């Protein structure tokens, strides 16, 4: 009985693991898209005002540099120190996916 319960519990956890992981797209929509745009182009009112980079075309930065800017901010971009390392990693991966 214990083995069956353990196996079932393990299967539930494994199948729902993605729900507990960081979701780069959701984080982007919540925290980044208002300036950087849904597609990373920066073609938003605030993005134009702040002259943000078009991440759908150019990404000349390392993952470590991107993570540092997300966590600590840079220039007019505010810091997101409250994000976990997993959240930051998911955001960096999502930014990479925006390049056309």
List each language-model region with its residue ranges.
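Generic hydrophobic secondary-structure packing signal
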Residues: 17-20, 36, 69, 91
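Extracytoplasmic electron-transfer domains, predominantly the class I c-type cytochrome c fold
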Residues: 49-100
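N-terminal export/targeting leaders of redox proteins
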Residues: 1-22, 100
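Amphipathic alpha-helical interaction segments
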Residues: 11, 35-36, 63, 88
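Electrostatic cytochrome c docking/interface patches
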Residues: 12-27, 43, 63-65
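Short, functional N-terminal and low-complexity linear motifs
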Residues: 2, 32-38, 56-61
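Periplasmic/extracellular electron-transfer cofactor-ligation site
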Residues: 25-51, 75-78, 97-100
